[in-house]
Design a protein with these regions (language model features):
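A structural signal for short hydrophobic beta-strand segments in well-ordered beta-sheet cores
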Residues: 25, 48, 88-90
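Short, highly charged C-terminal tails/helix-capping segments
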Residues: 137-149
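Soluble non-cytosolic domains of exported or imported proteins
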Residues: 5-12, 70, 113-120, 124
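A short, solvent-exposed beta-edge/loop patch
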Residues: 86-134
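Structured segments of extracytoplasmic/periplasmic soluble domains
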Residues: 17-24, 79-82, 129-136, 140
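Short, internal acidic amphipathic alpha-helical interface segments
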Residues: 59-101, 105
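Long, continuous compositionally biased terminal/linker segments
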Residues: 41-68
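Charge-rich, low-complexity N-terminal segments
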Residues: 1-45
Length: 149
């Protein structure tokens, strides 16, 4: 069995820290052995999933968000060519006329011990890149039709 991480953050402390910054942080959810915090920031909600967890600390986290709409594979490929840290994954619409999906992810390996404040810089980077990705999608969206007179 792998040794428990000596570095990282606890889920509870991270939730408290994010809420203290003004994030609308939900209760932790566990799915397939992974714990996730949903942050209902508007207009861009996102998730923080904890990996490589021991009894108290997790030393690997992933920020992620899901976008749906008139998204193209070319938009996602273009983003990935131009941006090193925030990676996007494209899923075409399941049905003709349906909405495509893009998932963006930012992985962070933590080398500090215990304090959620070690997430300061990664969180700032995440929020900047998340906003930039959303702005890129909006800028590429087809122009809205002029309102009927």
């Amino acid at each position: 069995a792998a040794a428990a991480p000596a570095n990282g953050v606890s889920v509870a402390e991270t939730r408290t820290w994010l809420a203290g910054l003004g994030g609308a942080v939900g209760e932790p959810t566990v799915r397939d052995g992974l714990t996730t915090l949903h942050v209902a920031d508007q207009p861009l909600p996102w998730n923080l999933t904890f990996y490589a967890c021991g009894p108290s600390l997790c030393d690997d986290v992933q920020f992620s968000a899901i976008f749906t709409g008139a998204i193209t594979a070319e938009q996602v490929s273009s983003w990935n060519r131009e941006h090193r840290f925030l990676k996007a994954f494209y899923t075409p619409a399941a049905t003709p006329g349906g909405e495509a999906t893009a998932v963006v992810q930012y992985d962070v390996v933590l080398t500090g011990t215990g304090a959620a404040q070690q997430l300061n810089e990664p969180t700032v980077i995440w929020l900047q890149l998340l906003r930039a990705f959303a702005e890129r999608l909006v800028a590429a969206a087809p122009a809205a039709a002029a309102p009927a007179q």
